[in-house]
Swiss-Prot record:
Name by which UniProt lists this protein: ATP synthase subunit b'
Gene from which this protein is expressed: atpF2
Membrane-related topology note: Single-pass membrane protein
One function term, GO molecular function aspect: proton-transporting ATPase activity, rotational mechanism
Subunit note: F-type ATPases have 2 components, F(1) - the catalytic core - and F(0) - the membrane proton channel. F(1) has five subunits: alpha(3), beta(3), gamma(1), delta(1), epsilon(1). F(0) has four main subunits: a(1), b(1), b'(1) and c(10-14). The alpha and beta chains form an alternating ring which encloses part of the gamma chain. F(1) is attached to F(0) by a central stalk formed by the gamma and epsilon chains, while a peripheral stalk is formed by the delta, b and b' chains.
Record flagged with keyword Transmembrane: yes
The keyword DNA damage is assigned to this record: no
Taxonomic superkingdom: Bacteria
Organism field: Nostoc punctiforme (strain ATCC 29133 / PCC 73102)
Protein function: F(1)F(0) ATP synthase produces ATP from ADP in the presence of a proton or sodium gradient. F-type ATPases consist of two structural domains, F(1) containing the extramembraneous catalytic core and F(0) containing the membrane proton channel, linked together by a central stalk and a peripheral stalk. During catalysis, ATP synthesis in the catalytic domain of F(1) is coupled via a rotary mechanism of the central stalk subunits to proton translocation. Component of the F(0) channel, it forms part of the peripheral stalk, linking F(1) to F(0). The b'-subunit is a diverged and duplicated form of b found in plants and photosynthetic bacteria.
Family that this chain belongs to: Belongs to the ATPase B chain family.
One Pfam family this sequence matches: ATP-synt_B
InterPro entries, alphabetized: ATP_synth_b, ATP_synth_B-like_membr_sf, ATP_synth_b/b'su_bac/chlpt, ATP_synthase_B_chain
Lineage, opening ranks: Bacteria, Bacillati, Cyanobacteriota, Cyanophyceae, Nostocales
Amino acid sequence: MFDFDATLPFMALQFLLLAAVLNAIFYKPLTKVLDDRDSYIRTNTLEARESLAKAERLATEYEQQLADARRQSQATVEAAQLEAKKITAEKIAEAQKEAQSQREQASVEIEQQKQQAFSTLEQQVDALSRQILEKLLGPTPVR
């Protein structure tokens, strides 16, 4: 069946030589390329994870800053509204005070005019009364 002559060791030597040549020419560069590719993928994956973590951290930080800015703007708006209400209340109080002052002044003027009108009417009544008496009684002799 099998002949064990020089062909078998020669074929074994040829197989080993082919395996060594293929290993040197094909498998080592292929393994190196695969290792480099694996290293590149791992590096990129790690960098991507770091970038994603950094982006998430920045997004959280920006959201916090945005929330702080909203709170500050809300506080500013509320402070402005309170200030506006305070100013409005002061202006209303001032206007009411001025209106009250004008009412009091008008009341005083009306009272003065009333007294003046009564005084004028009294003088006219006295004068008319004397005229009526003179017409009724006649002229009175001067003493």
